[in-house]
Design a protein with these regions (language model features):
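Phosphate-moiety recognition in structured ligand-binding domains
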Residues: 150-179
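Active-site pocket-lining segment
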Residues: 140-153
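Accessory alpha-helical/coil subdomains and C-terminal extensions
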Residues: 2-140
Length: 179
């Protein structure tokens, strides 16, 4: 799937998670793919149908992530709605460009692994708990991982047409050139 399909997955996942969060109020953190580009995380905003729908907070890698501001944002959102749904790109980093959390492992391309381990979700959940000292706050975190770019049942019509056209072209080219 292309961007439209991946964005659809993210938006639908947040729609579902927001419904769950309404029923079981608390704080939910979802980590979305995006090492240095936040377009998939930004697509989570498509889940908003009403003013109080989540995600309430969206953090992109193109913006500096400030831990203290994050904690205050969560406190403010909880005060306003009694719940909070957060979309965080796996590539969020501090003012010095350091990732907020890593697993310490490297991927097959030699890049620091950001979201494959769930480390960022755990880090953000711990920061949320720090924001409410002495209070018992329900906090959950998930990492969408590869599902957002490969989930077969939500392929957009545009992506399906383009994939089919590329496949047809490849077969015709191979047949006409003998390659």
């Amino acid at each position: 799937p292309g961007f439209a399909s991946a964005a659809r997955f993210v938006a639908l996942a947040f729609m579902g998670d927001d419904r769950d969060n309404r029923a079981l109020q608390g704080i939910k953190v979802n980590v979305v793919m995006g090492r240095s580009a936040g377009f998939l995380t930004a697509a989570s905003a498509l889940a908003r149908q009403a003013a109080d729908d989540g995600p309430h907070l969206i953090y992109l890698p193109e913006r500096v992530f400030d831990v203290e501001k994050f904690k205050q944002d969560v406190r403010d959102t909880m005060a306003k709605y009694g719940r909070c749904v957060i979309a965080a790109s796996e590539g969020i980093s501090d003012k010095d460009g350091n990732p907020i959390s890593t697993s310490g492992e490297k991927d097959s391309h030699g890049n620091i692994q950001l979201s494959g381990s769930g480390a960022l979700g755990d880090t953000l959940a711990a920061l949320v708990k720090e924001a409410f000292p002495g209070q018992k706050v329900r906090v959950r975190a998930d990492t969408f991982g590869y599902l957002q770019r490969s989930f077969p049942t939500i392929i957009s019509p545009v992506d399906a047409r383009e994939a089919r056209a590329v496949g047809d072209y490849a077969v015709n080219h191979a047949a006409s050139t003998g390659q």
